[in-house]
């Protein structure tokens, strides 16, 4: 397909610093390596809905270690990925089960509202059980490494920034459109087929919708890197579930350790949460920081 690309979006592919910091992302983008979610879908997980949450977290921790080993092997030999059959239950399925449980006592973000979203209760972000989408399009205004970017803007946010550029989305000035995981997966595939370099999960804020995103990528059958485009105000549990799922963490670093975060964005303890999540993201994937 013919398209007009920004010159910096072309030049960045040859930039040595960009290749050093985002080398795996570029390889997935060019189908030379496999996106994390696709590897997670091939990794066998043995668990039951009868298992306690503590037991499931332990299994998830063990599988996360195994995932990194398997990813390392597949990065060297992509053919190994094709040889492995899809198991009845996978590492990705385990993540979906864990996220389902979090919905009953919601703590995807650091506010830990603890509402049961499966019963229709709403917390600070006002996100319910079914994901609502504002818009889906090929974005040409992101960082050069990302464009054209397959952006999916979901409703709601875990913060309330007075300077928010997407206020109508984050604060529910729009109704949004409900998407089932299978339908949203088709949108992701269409964006990729049309030349988008990635699936850019944004909003608002993607954090409240992590369960729905995990369920969506269970049905995506194209190799596409996932960009987790977040305000970084998410919980340790969300950070664990993002391991082996997000290829690139596109994270905000909005504030220092003073009172600005709470005054401007209603985000108490932002500095501590933000620092911890950036350090964790740097260990688990590749990182782009917005300041």
What do the PLM-derived regions correspond to, one by one?
Residues 1-92:
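N-terminal alpha-helical interaction blocks
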Residues 136-179, 183-206:
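Long, charge-rich boundary regions
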Residues 108-109, 113, 150-154, 166, ...:
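Long, contiguous hydrophobic alpha-helical segments, chiefly transmembrane helices and signal peptides
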Residues 70-153, 167-171:
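N-terminal [4Fe-4S]-dependent radical SAM core
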Residues 181-291:
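Conserved AdoMet/S-adenosylmethionine-binding subsite of the radical SAM
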Residues 111-114, 162, 166, 279, ...:
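Generic secondary-structure signature for well-ordered alpha-helical cores
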Residues 119, 135, 161-162, 211, ...:
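Short acidic, gly/pro-rich beta-turn/loop elements at beta-sheet edges
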């Amino acid at each position: 397909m013919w398209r007009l690309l920004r010159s910096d979006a072309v030049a960045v592919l040859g930039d040595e610093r960009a290749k050093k910091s985002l080398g795996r992302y570029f390889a997935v983008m060019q189908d030379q390596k496999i996106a994390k979610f696709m590897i997670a879908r091939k990794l066998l997980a043995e668990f039951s809905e009868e298992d306690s949450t503590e037991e499931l977290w332990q299994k998830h921790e063990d599988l996360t270690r195994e995932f990194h080993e398997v990813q390392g092997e597949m990065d060297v030999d992509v053919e190994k990925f094709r040889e492995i059959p899809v198991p009845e239950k996978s590492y990705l399925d385990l993540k979906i089960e864990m996220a389902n449980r979090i919905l009953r006592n919601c703590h995807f973000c650091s506010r830990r509202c603890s509402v049961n979203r499966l019963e229709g209760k709403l917390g600070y972000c006002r996100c319910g059980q079914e994901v609502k989408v504002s818009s889906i399009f090929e974005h040409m205004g992101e960082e050069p490494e990302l464009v054209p970017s397959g952006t999916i803007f979901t409703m709601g946010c875990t913060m309330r920034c007075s300077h928010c550029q997407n206020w109508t989305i984050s604060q529910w000035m729009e109704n949004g459109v409900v998407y089932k995981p299978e339908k949203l997966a088709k949108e992701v595939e269409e964006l990729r087929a049309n030349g988008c370099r990635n699936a850019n999960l944004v909003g608002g804020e993607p954090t409240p919708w992590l369960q729905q995103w995990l369920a969506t990528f269970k049905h995506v059958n194209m190799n596409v890197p996932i960009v987790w485009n977040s305000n970084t105000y998410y919980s340790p549990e969300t950070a664990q579930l993002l391991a082996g799922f997000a290829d690139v963490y596109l994270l905000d670093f909005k504030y220092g350790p003073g009172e600005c975060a709470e005054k401007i964005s209603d985000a108490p303890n932002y500095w501590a949460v933000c620092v911890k999540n950036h350090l964790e993201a740097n260990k688990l994937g590749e990182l782009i920081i917005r300041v």
